[in-house]
From Swiss-Prot:
Residues 1231-1331 form the SH2 domain. SUPFAM superfamilies: Nucleic acid-binding proteins, Ribonuclease H-like, RuvA domain 2-like, SH2 domain, Tex N-terminal region-like. It comes from the Eukaryota. Keywords: Chromosome, Nucleus, SH2 domain, Transcription. This is Transcription elongation factor spt6. Residues 1-164, 1185-1221 are annotated as: Disordered.
Length: 1422
């Protein structure tokens, strides 16, 4: 079967798509098709060997494809029950082989055996146990392994007719949804009763009968031989040992029950436990995992500090006099990170002084003996929080650098010790290499220069290690043959080495001069002829090639080219043939379709543009080329560095040869460096975009909760949130939820009509206005939040604002500056809903409030966003990458983006701090713990677990170390990192409470804080001692708070404190003292900015999904007509914006009535003339003259940056093709019709739901239509519809045919019974338990993991085929050692198609697959 046969009729694919044919056959398909049609009678006459093979094959798949993902314990119990059942049936079959005469004969020969036959049979079965229960079981045919209840139900439709077998074989425990009858369950219970071990002595009942003796004779026997229980103790010990072994078998680890991927997802692996318990910050452990074995020497540590400083100075503008302090600051931060294991937030908060350069300057006019007050301190901040994260990343990169350098050094050391190699190039360039590229250059040089020695060294190592492998015949490379032959003399005759030439090109050190030989190259070559190179021309060619390769492999020369490339690099973009047609002027890629001569500095200013270019290149629409500008000039500048200065014919001859060599080398070097430059630019652009996303995210995090009127910043408001979602106000219900300041949802419900009436016109208020007013008066919210998913939200906002205004609804009263109680009118605000959209359908929402509707969940999230944006963002976890922060964000790898966004969360969480006791009881606060300094998801969960074990309350910070607590929650190092960021509410009544535990002051600075408090209270040492003896160590600070004397700390002169600390303790604490002073006055003051209200543009983008780039004046867009009047037309854009067509812009044809041209529900193209982003309205034109001239989206460009000539040629070429077609644009009156091509249809459906449809013109002519529908995200199917029985050229045919198989009466019939039917089947497939989200490779990986964890089982799963819309892969693996296979599953309106067999639903498809596979295996056996 060919792959092309998988697509039923080419008409299914629209030729506008330029669809590729199914390039690769699905593996296993041909075999399956052949096997499916093969009869399979069981042949009992096969030889024993064949039977064994069949038994092996059966066992490989019998654990197979019908298994549900049950737990391992249930599987084991089920297998035991089924094997017992099989043994019983085996004995019954054996009994059937004996006829009545045989049984009678046995009874006559031994009458005593007639009665106990059944009992002995049972005894033997129990004694045999589970070890040999399968030994004598005949092989069941592999064609029977898939028999199941499901197959019996559906076999009449697509299976073998009337061929049912009553079998209980090993496959029975894999039947989906097994149901056991009451009789079977009763038999299972009886089996379990019988299986109980009995005493092994002869003292039980029936012993007399069994021996055939009377009681007296039995007594005599007992007297002589004992009662049979003398050794019972040994048998009992044996029983106990067996029971103990069974108990040990029953003891299961998590890894025995769950798959490795599940354990990793839940962070329950051994590695996770190690991270959890190791006393080192979690983020440090994870980041440094690859470099655990890299230990830096002191010299390397100093080198690293300089390396990082130089990297950062390239991007920072720092005054020359600050460069040295900057380098010292970087070195100190590196010491804190690496040696002390302090995380970035700790360093930034508690080691600020090392990031500030302070200089004392005397006040003008002050005398030389002036005191300290006559000096001013000028402080320069050298490093910010982002710089600290950069240093952390650079540290990891340097460790990778050192690891690679050590590997290369070890290789070179071995070469030295074994072959006495000494190479100045390696010894000079290896220590000097500062990038991975430069190290790779050295490595390439070694492998080129010493290839044969390295081969010998590998063989020697393998001999030492005892490895035996076949030695390959020694085959020297071309360059080795030259180097080891005579021809190498000609290479040396060039008069300069590759390294010396590279040194000249680098302009480093003393110039190296070139020496000319006494003979011409051709003459000298004659003397080097040998067996390898038979004439002079061959010798010259070989010598030039080797010398050119030596230049290419020279690390110095590569450095020259690389530096020059970055200085002179330019980027060009060329459209491909595919891009010529696909990228029209409305396409987002048109911005760079003809872009040329982009300097690397231009790329740096717009990194997302370069990433989009590379994305378009991946899609085959453009080709991105990075080139070396003015490369010929660069080449000319290098010639003198390799040529000799002599003037003679001989010198000219040699210089020509040298230039030839250089040309060869530069050609190779240009190609080599080009690849790395292109990739490096991509990495830099990705890093830049990710950091831009981090900056934007930081701004969104840096906002306090909405501040109620009259309250201090940081107060959590009570919120009433309302939304209609994407519904129409007045038509769909308005969902609402009221949330208290503690985050509890106290009430929720729905309103329908909140419109305000008009007394003058006797129009009453809406029926829900009174209920709304009553709710507000009863709950007294601080703010009303509104949001939604369409411009209708603006109407809801205005409606609520009007109700608040007319009914004079006010918030909670508060006391103003004049001690008067006042209340302000409630504020209605539009809330950012980016978190709420993700929350409403999430599993977390269903868990938090199972009974709420999705839109109520949405309202809850809106309210909580107003209460704490930080908590809501933190609750998203990895889903945070779903939020759009910057253009081009989706072009950055998720891991890189997530890492950057996580650092922003870490920064803000540690700025705000976490109430540890609140985190124990409140899940939203607990979501912040993983971002606390020193912690992570594993350590945070462990911390909560230990706190709960210790009673559920933390009384002071030192309790976390286990002081006065049963269990320690963390080690000292982690505690030092996180202590100041976990605060404990201070209560005066608790004598053990330390007020400083409620501040940002670190425990290491508590003594300084207490000294400052004592000095502020003017207490002497005796007063301090008396106070602390009576009330504990926190007494002084408690007294400061109790007497409300915090303002006195402002009188302290902190400069003197700082000088004393630095002088006596060598600690720089000036900035820390400022922090302590601030905390003593207002503990954990809210440092975030005020809540940020959305701007007009933000609201417009949130409610429409459009930005200034995607929707602007001058663009041509489709509009749906709502009403047609003689003087205007009302319409709507796809994004929900109201469109008005004024009379002057209706048409160019005034001879035809407007109503004859346009009708309601018709979709037409229109040009935007005016866009009102605040009111969500626009004026548009339908005139052909306007629509045909959209505003070009190309920017003003410098000369030479845009290829106008190519653009004009392409435009003319496309116009010729359009004119040769001679067709006018077709318009159909249907709400789903759009005047799109295939690309536009895909872009339009990209943001729509699965199963949404666009009807559009077809390029095949007026008797065809194209229907595009969304199969899944990024996957669209284009269906070609053939129209028959048409009234005229522009009408829709009365009969519509799809693929030559399906016929429909009209478009609605086709949409409902064809497209929507297939969409339902796609949904059914993707909701099935066997469906795997992800790629085919990911599904294969899952199958590999599953079968490794369950070696005797087989498994199968479905996944989507992204290359062929409407198809899925059925991937399967028949056991651990079997090959992976996949079969194509086609979605059809009536169900699914597998191997040309139709199946109505997923149940039938699964059973059909099992039958097909069984038949295929049977066919193989035959």
């Amino acid at each position: 079967m060919s792959a092309r046969d998988l697509v039923e009729g080419e008409a299914m694919l629209d030729d506008e798509e330029n669809e590729e044919e199914l390039a690769d056959d699905y593996d296993g398909e041909g075999e399956a098709h052949q096997g499916a049609g093969t009869a399979n009678p069981y042949d009992s006459s096969e030889e024993d060997d064949d039977d064994d093979d069949d038994e092996e094959a059966a066992r490989a798949v019998r654990e197979g494809f019908i298994v549900d993902e049950d737990e391992e314990l249930e599987d084991r119990a089920e297998r035991r029950r089924e094997k017992r059942k099989r043994r019983r049936e085996e004995r019954e079959r054996e009994d059937e082989h004996l006829d009545e005469e045989d049984l009678e004969l046995i009874g006559e020969l031994n009458p005593s055996l007639q009665a106990p036959v059944a009992a002995e049979s049972k005894f033997k079965r129990l004694k045999r146990g589970h070890k040999d229960r399968d030994l004598r079981q005949p092989s069941q045919g592999i064609d029977d392994i898939f028999n199941s209840d499901e197959e019996e139900e559906a076999a009449g439709d697509y299976g073998r007719h009337g061929h049912r077998r009553h079998m209980h074989d090993e496959m029975d425990d894999f039947i989906e949804e097994d149901v056991f009858s009451d009789e079977e369950l009763q038999r299972e219970r009886e089996d379990l009763e019988i299986a109980r071990p009995a005493k092994k002595g002869m003292t039980g009942l029936g012993a007399t009968d069994a021996a055939g003796l009377d009681e007296n004779a039995l007594e005599d026997m007992r007297a002589a031989f004992g009662d049979g229980n003398e050794y019972l103790f040994a048998l009992e010990m044996e029983d106990q040992e067996e029971e103990q072994e069974e108990d040990e078998e029953k003891h299961l680890d998590l890894k025995d029950v769950f798959e490795p991927s599940q354990l990793a997802e839940k962070m329950l692996t051994e590695e996770d436990n190690q991270i959890r318990l190791l006393d080192e910050p979690e983020r440090h452990q994870i980041a440094r995992k690859p470099y655990r074995n890299v230990v830096l020497t002191e010299e390397q540590f100093r080198e690293e500090a300089a390396w990082i400083s130089n990297l950062m100075l390239l991007k920072k503008r720092i005054e020359p006099e600050l460069r040295e302090p900057f380098q010292r600051s970087v070195a100190k931060v590196l010491e804190f990170l690496v040696t002390d294991d302090w995380e970035v937030p700790f360093i930034f908060q508690h080691r600020k002084d090392y990031m500030i350069h302070a200089v004392k300057a005397p006040v003008e006019g002050a005398g030389e003996d002036g005191d300290a007050s006559q000096y001013t301190v000028r402080a320069e901040k050298l490093l910010n929080m982002t710089d600290l994260w950069d240093i952390f990343d650079h540290d990891l990169k340097f460790k990778a650098l050192v690891e690679k350098r050590n590997t290369i050094q070890k290789t070179y050391d071995n070469l030295q010790s074994l072959f006495n190699v000494s190479d100045s190039v390696v010894e000079e360039m290896l220590p000097a290499a500062v990038t991975m590229e430069e190290l790779q250059d050295v490595q390439d040089y070694i492998h080129f220069q010493y290839a044969s020695q390295l081969r010998d060294m590998t063989l020697m190592n393998s001999d030492v290690n005892g490895e035996t492998h076949r030695r390959k015949a020694s085959s020297k490379t071309f360059f080795e043959r030259v180097r080891n032959g005579k021809a190498y003399g000609l290479v040396r005759a060039f008069g300069i080495t590759a390294d010396a030439f590279a040194q000249n090109a680098l302009k480093e050190g003393r110039r190296q001069y070139t020496e000319d030989p006494a003979e011409r190259p051709e003459e000298m070559a004659d003397g080097f002829v040998d067996n390898d190179f038979s004439n002079a021309s061959h010798v010259i060619k070989a010598a030039k090639s080797l010398f050119a390769e030596e230049i290419v492999m020279s690390p110095k020369m590569r450095k020259v080219i690389r530096q020059a490339y970055y200085m002179n690099g330019a980027v060009d973009c060329f459209r491909t043939e595919k891009g010529l047609r696909r990228i029209d002027e409305q396409h987002p890629y048109y911005e760079f379709k003809y872009l040329r001569n982009q300097q690397l500095s231009d790329i740096a200013r717009r990194p997302e543009l370069y990433l989009r270019m590379l994305k378009a290149e991946e899609e085959g629409l453009v080709e991105v080329k990075v080139r070396f500008e003015n490369f010929d000039q660069f080449r000319q500048r290098l010639y003198p560095d390799i040529e000799s200065d002599n003037y003679s014919e001989i010198a000219d001859g040699w210089n020509r040869s040298r230039r030839d060599v250089l040309d060869m080398a530069l050609g190779k070097l240009e190609r080599l460096i080009n690849r790395s430059v292109k990739e490096n630019i991509r990495q830099e652009c990705e890093n830049h975009v990710a950091k831009e996303c981090r900056e934007t995210f930081s701004q969104r995090l840096d906002q306090a909760p909405y501040k109620p009127k009259g309250m201090v910043l940081g107060t959590v408001p009570r919120v009433l949130a309302l939304s209609t979602g994407s519904g129409v106000v007045g038509r769909e219900p308005i969902h609402w939820a009221y949330i208290e300041e503690d985050g509890r949802v106290l009430e929720n419900g729905k309103f329908v009509d909140l419109s305000i009436g008009d007394r003058d016109r006797n129009i009453p208020d809406g029926k829900d206005v009174e209920a709304f007013v009553e709710l507000v008066d009863r709950r007294r919210p601080d703010v009303i939040g509104v949001s939604g998913m369409s411009p209708e939200t603006r109407r809801l906002y205005k409606l609520l604002a009007e109700v608040v205004d007319k009914k004079d609804l006010r918030g909670a009263p508060y006391t103003d500056d004049h001690d008067e109680e006042i209340s302000d009118r409630l504020e209605v605000i539009i809330v950012n809903d980016e978190v709420a959209r993700l929350y409403q359908h999430s599993e977390r929402a269903k868990k938090d409030h199972p009974s709420f509707a999705p839109l109520t969940h949405y309202c809850v999230a809106l309210a909580k966003y107003l209460q704490s944006p930080l908590k809501e963002y933190a609750s998203l976890g990895r889903d945070i990458v779903s939020i759009q922060f910057k253009p081009g964000q989706q072009l950055v790898t998720q891991e890189l983006l997530l890492k950057q966004l996580e650092t922003a969360l870490v920064d803000m969480v540690n700025l705000v701090g976490v109430d540890i006791n609140e985190a124990v009881t409140d899940s939203s606060t607990a979501n912040l713990l993983p971002y606390v300094c020193g912690l992570g998801p594993r350590k945070a969960a462990h911390l909560l677990k230990i706190v709960n074990m210790n009673g559920g309350v933390v009384n002071n910070r030192v309790e976390l170390l286990g002081v006065n607590a049963q269990y320690p929650a963390m080690g000292v190092k982690v505690w030092n990192n996180c202590a100041s960021f976990l605060y404990i509410d201070f209560e005066n009544v608790d004598p053990d409470a330390d007020p400083l535990d409620n501040t940002r002051v670190h425990p290491e600075d508590y003594d300084i804080a207490r000294k400052m408090a004592a000095d502020a209270l003017e207490l002497d040492e005796e007063d301090i001692k008396a106070e602390t003896d009576e009330n504990g160590t926190g007494a002084i600070v408690r007294k400061l708070f109790r007497e409300e004397a915090q303002d006195r700390v402002n009188d302290l002169i902190l400069e003197e404190y700082a000088e004393q600390l630095e002088k006596n303790l060598n600690q720089r604490k000036r900035a820390t003292l400022e922090t302590i002073r601030a905390e003593l006055q207002q503990p954990y003051e809210e440092l975030r900015k005020q809540y940020v209200f959305l701007s007009t543009d933000d609201i417009f983008t949130m409610l429409t999904g459009e930005t200034s780039d995607t929707l602007a004046e001058g663009m041509v867009v489709p509009i749906s007509i709502k009403r047609v009047s003689d003087d205007h037309i009302d319409g709507k854009l796809d994004c929900g914006i109201d469109a008005l067509v004024p009379e002057s812009e209706l048409t160019d044809r005034y001879d035809i009535p407007v109503r004859a041209l346009y009708s309601p529900h018709q979709t037409v193209s229109a040009k935007i003339l005016f866009l009102n982003r605040k009111n969500f309205t626009c004026n548009v034109s339908l005139r052909e003259e306007q629509v045909s001239r959209p505003v070009s989206n190309t920017q003003d460009r410098l000369r030479g940056e845009w290829d106008e000539r190519q653009e004009q040629q392409d435009r003319e070429s496309l116009q010729e093709k359009t004119q040769s077609g001679g067709r006018t644009m077709r318009v159909i009156k249907h709400p789903l019709f759009r005047p799109f091509n295939s690309t536009q249809a895909e872009e339009f459906l990209g943001s729509q739901s699965r199963g949404d449809v666009v009807i559009r013109p077809s390029s095949k002519g007026h008797d065809h239509l194209a229907v595009t529908w969304k199969v899944a995200d990024g996957i669209f199917q284009h269906i070609d519809v053939l129209e028959l029985d048409k009234e005229n050229e522009f009408s829709v045919g009365r009969t519509l045919k799809v693929g030559g198989r399906y016929t429909y009466s009209d478009l609605d019939d086709l949409i409902f019974n064809h497209v929507k039917a297939m969409a339902k089947k796609v949904d059914e497939m993707m909701l099935h338990e066997k469906y795997q989200d992800g790629t085919k490779d990911a599904t294969y990986s899952w199958l590999e993991t599953y079968t490794k964890a369950n070696p005797k089982r087989s498994a199968y799963a479905f996944c989507i085929d992204p290359k062929h819309a409407g198809y899925f892969f059925l991937c399967f693996k028949a056991g651990e050692n079997a090959r992976l296979h996949s079969w194509p599953v086609k979605v059809i309106p009536q169900g699914y198609e597998l191997q040309r067999n139709p199946y109505p639903d997923m149940r039938a498809l699964c059973n059909g697959f099992k039958l097909l596979f069984t038949n295929m295996q049977a066919g193989k056996r035959r």
